[in-house]
C-alpha cells in the first residue's frame, strides 16, 4: 500500500471548520515537501464528529459538503485523503472520494461498518478501541478480510486508564505489528483526557513529543497527528491538537528517528 522506507504521516485538522481547511492543507504540504523522499503524507479531516461530548458542540459541515471539500483538496493538492465514517451508508459515499476510510475507535467492533468498509475496496484504517487489548484486534481485522480486502492499517490511540485518562502501552505496537499490517500511532488522541472538561475532552499536548518518539522507536510505520494553525481556537479537540508550528518543529526528529530504526531493523534481520 505504501513504501516501507517512508514514514506515513496522516495529518490534518480534527474537523472541517470552514474554508480555512484549504490553507491548512496547503501549509501542511509546504511543511512536508522538504521530506518528500522520507515521508508519505496523507491529509485527514472529518465531515462529522459524531461522538462529541455535548450535543451543543460543533460537529462539522456534514457528509455532502464535507466530502465535496475533501474532493477539492484532493484535486488541488494531489494528496491522498482519509476521513472517518460512522455507518455503512457513509462508508460507501466516503469511498467515492477518499483513498482511506477510517473506522473510529468507538466503532471498531461494528460488524456491518467494518464489512461495508472492506467491500468498498478502499484502504481501511481501523483505530483500536480504548477498551480493547491489542490481541482483540484480530476480530475487526477478520471482518474486513472477509470481504477480500486486505488493505488494512491499524492505529493505536491509547487505552482507558481509570476515569478521564488514557495511557499508551508501547507493547501494543509490537502486538499489532505481528498481524502483518502497517501500524500507525495516533499522537494527539493519545494525549486526550476524555470528558475531563465535562462538555469536552481535555488534553496534555506536552506529552506528544515523547509519545511519538517512543512509538517510532517501537516500530510504527507512521504517525496520525491532528493539527491546526491555532489549536486553542479550534472547534473540536482544541486541547489535544498539535499546532502547525509545532508539527514543523517536530517533523525532522521524527524522520531522523524513523530512518534510524529502519536501518537498525535491517541490520538485525
Swiss-Prot record:
The keyword rRNA processing does not apply. Its EC number is 2.5.1.55. SUPFAM superfamilies: Aldolase. It is an enzyme of class 2 (transferase). Pathway: Carbohydrate biosynthesis; 3-deoxy-D-manno-octulosonate biosynthesis; 3-deoxy-D-manno-octulosonate from D-ribulose 5-phosphate: step 2/3; Bacterial outer membrane biogenesis; lipopolysaccharide biosynthesis. GO terms for biological process: keto-3-deoxy-D-manno-octulosonic acid biosynthetic process. Keywords: Cytoplasm, Lipopolysaccharide biosynthesis, Transferase. It comes from Chlamydia trachomatis serovar L2 (strain ATCC VR-902B / DSM 19102 / 434/Bu). The keyword Lyase does not apply. One of its GO terms (cellular component) is cytoplasm. It holds the Pfam family DAHP_synth_1. GO terms for molecular function: 3-deoxy-8-phosphooctulonate synthase activity. This is 2-dehydro-3-deoxyphosphooctonate aldolase. It is found in: Cytoplasm. Belongs to the KdsA family.
Amino acid at each position: 500500500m505504501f513504501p516501507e522506507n517512508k514514514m506515513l504521516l496522516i495529518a490534518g485538522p480534527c474537523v472541517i471548520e470552514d474554508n480555512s481547511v484549504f490553507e491548512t492543507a496547503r501549509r501542511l504540504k509546504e511543511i512536508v515537501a522538504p521530506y518528500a523522499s522520507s515521508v508519505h503524507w496523507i491529509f485527514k479531516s472529518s465531515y462529522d464528529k459524531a461522538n462529541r461530548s455535548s450535543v451543543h458542540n460543533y460537529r462539522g459541515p456534514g457528509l455532502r459538503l464535507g466530502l465535496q471539500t475533501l474532493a477539492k483538496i484532493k484535486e488541488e493538492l494531489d494528496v491522498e485523503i482519509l476521513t472517518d465514517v460512522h455507518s455503512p451508508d457513509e462508508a460507501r459515499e466516503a469511498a467515492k472520494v477518499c483513498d482511506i476510510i477510517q473506522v473510529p475507535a468507538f466503532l471498531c467492533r461494528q460488524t456491518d461498518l467494518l464489512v461495508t468498509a472492506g467491500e468498498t475496496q478502499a484502504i481501511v484504517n481501523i483505530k483500536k478501541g480504548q477498551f480493547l487489548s491489542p490481541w482483540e484486534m484480530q476480530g475487526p481485522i477478520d471482518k474486513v478480510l472477509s470481504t477480500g480486502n486486505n488493505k488494512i492499517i491499524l492505529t493505536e490511540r491509547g487505552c482507558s486508564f481509570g476515569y478521564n485518562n488514557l495511557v499508551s502501552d508501547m507493547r501494543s505496537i509490537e502486538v499489532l505489528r505481528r498481524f502483518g499490517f502497517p501500524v500507525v500511532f495516533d499522537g494527539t488522541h493519545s494525549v486526550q483526557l476524555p470528558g475531563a472538561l465535562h462538555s469536552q475532552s481535555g488534553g496534555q499536548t506536552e506529552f506528544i513529543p515523547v509519545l511519538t518518539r517512543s512509538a517510532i522507536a517501537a516500530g510504527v510505520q507512521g504517525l496520525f497527528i491532528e493539527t491546526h494553525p491555532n489549536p486553542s481556537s479550534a472547534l473540536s479537540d482544541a486541547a489535544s491538537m498539535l499546532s502547525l508550528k509545532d508539527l514543523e518543529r517536530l517533523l525532522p526528529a521524527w524522520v531522523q528517528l524513523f530512518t534510524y530504526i529502519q536501518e537498525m531493523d535491517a541490520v538485525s534481520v
